[in-house]
């Protein structure tokens, strides 16, 4: 199999990278109608598999779970989750032949083996669904020409898919049809019905492409969503302790600080996040973020370049073939860091203190979000898609750190995201340690900014620059479709 993206000519690559359209709510008047009365079989019962299935069943669809024979016989976690929630469970051979739609929600590294097992069992004219297109785009999986291939990709972890549905809402979602596999022209109808069954149509749906979803998703998770949070956590913790902060306080400020800071980001973008700072602190955070952007642009560009060329995926798949030797080694290294092993802190940190004592963290968030967005757009990815893959998902990932630090983040995200996270942070940490962290001044981290001198013209210009950045312009529009977003952050 060959990387699908690399088989396209330049015009085709640009067309698929740039495919992104915000769908009107009127396009979902039929909601789940196209799949009513049809058999939907989900392969895999992890976070996405279980929670999407629960939503789809509650939306009136016929859902069953196909699991490997060994998983059923040994009553593994996937079998227990499916049966405890009252779903029909069977082997591939029992359930796949009767399915109108087979949804593959197993981890990326299992996709090829799963598809090779289920494809011969699928009836003629059935549909195959994904929630991430890496198997199609990067691996280059070849699907039978009579099979329709679609994607519904929620822009959040599976648990959030379920929680928002229970609230009568949903999560923003990308949908797509693989242009090589839409023999009956029904792919979009299938994808729309599946998305509606998860509740996505109530939060906003983007019609995209497999290519755009994969390339933007990889870029977001490697840089701002996971890589920058990991690098920032390690750097900021070490800096706080080196400056005399109590290790427990330093750990808590970082662990809960990302979540608290990005909650403002979720509700009002970079503008609101920066507005939570005093004016002197805002000016300082802006200056720091500009320094970070200049310093880190080549690193962000390299990640985007390696994603576009397929270099990233080929390296990761080589590690799959080597039993995840690199991934598991990097995971162990992270578990041994000072931040991960910092003591608990019983003291109270107020919500505002996370901002006042975390000016550098705010600057890191601003720089990372803007850089990821800018480079995706420069590469041909449409602004709406770049927004969802940078700013929108960040509070959800930050929330995982608040639970069990970096360990929890790396458990919740996919192995693909975790592998890319380590590639980024392993370069970012020494780069910033050598060229940036030593230039910090009092008030950047762990203490409030004390300089109260304000230049009105400078403040005016900074506010204008923040509010008119392209990610803020598109973000205001997209957040208008998500007026019922619940508050995540609780602080500590």
Swiss-Prot record:
GO biological process: isoleucine biosynthetic process; L-valine biosynthetic process
Binding-site residues for Mg(2+) 2, renumbered to this chain: 217, 389, 393
Gene Ontology CC, one term: cytosol
Cofactor annotation comment: Binds 2 magnesium ions per subunit.
Residue positions binding substrate: 414
Catalytic residues identified in the record: 132
Gene3D superfamilies for the chain: N-(1-d-carboxylethyl)-l-norvaline Dehydrogenase, domain 2 (1.10.1040.10), NAD(P)-binding Rossmann-like Domain (3.40.50.720)
Enzyme Commission no: 1.1.1.86
Keywords of the record: Amino-acid biosynthesis, Branched-chain amino acid biosynthesis, Magnesium, Metal-binding, NADP, Oxidoreductase, Repeat
Protein name: Ketol-acid reductoisomerase (NADP(+))
Biological classification of the source: Bacteria, Pseudomonadati, Pseudomonadota, Gammaproteobacteria, Enterobacterales
